[in-house]
Amino acid sequence: MIWRLNVRLSCLLACWLPLAAHAVDVEPGKDPVPSVMWAFYHKQFLAEAPFVFDERVKLLTPPFAEDARQVPLEIDARAFKGHVLKILAWAELNPLPKIVDFQPKAGVLPWLSLRIRIEQATPLRAAVLTDDGLWHVGSTLIDAAGGGCTAPSVVRTQPGWEEHIGEVLGGRYPRGEFSRVRVQVAHPMDNGMVSGIPEFYLNHAQLRGQDGQVLAELELFPAVSENPNLAFDIDAPGPTRLVLRDNSGNEFDAAIP
């Protein structure tokens, strides 16, 4: 029994030590967008785990946000296809910084497009966790006049908006070896920063394949713009379904042929 236990411990150590050595030896490199907040968010969101600043994680966004309530953001980690466990994105100087926790699975590429709100000029980060336990951090800067997080809702000014909550518009479009699913979801995405209006936002989404398997999971946060626009790249065959839930427990379901 003692011999078997020693063998098991030896096997565990043999598997763990290379990863531990990798974690200790990693050199993060220079922050491409130096920020006084990086150390805080490294601890807050990544639990001070090993990381590298990596230009292979691409964040595409306009240099200046003309409308700070609707800022297009594209996160591209396809350089790590097949090895991505999750992608975390945040805006460092937002009052509500976290944007999305995206977990692509088999059949979905590590690429995501959405629209966000920013309150002021800020560094944007996307941290990609790969299956070797290392975070790869992509960065960019965006300038803005500001006010995107505290601006009143446009959705709530439209007559009968409550009747359309959860409606999904969009489709699936071929793009060579994969297809792109692009949707817009009717929802005010209230972030609780406008007087008299509590938080009311979509906080969870699943993309499912034709046999019900989960292709991707997303945790959404109030930094996502109202009437969220989401896009995914899929290389799985057949139709898909988008299943959504908001923080009030409402659930929505849409078929995407």
Regions found by a protein language model. Name each.
Residues R115-A121, D233-G238:
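Surface-exposed, short loops/turns at beta-strand junctions within beta-sandwich domains
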Residues K105-L112, P222-D233:
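Aromatic sugar-binding surface patches on proteins
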Residues Q184-G196:
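Short amphipathic, basic-aromatic surface patches that mediate peripheral association
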Residues Y41-E66, Q158-P174:
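N-terminal edge beta-strand
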Residues P28-P34, A145-G170, G176-F178:
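Low-complexity, Pro/Ser/Thr- and charge-rich linker/hinge segments at domain boundaries
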Residues R69-L73, E177-V181:
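Structural beta-strand segments of beta-rich domains
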Residues L141-G147, P257:
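Short beta-strand edge segments in extracellular beta-sheet folds
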Residues D131-V137, D246-A254:
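Short acidic/polar inter-strand loop motif in beta-rich domains
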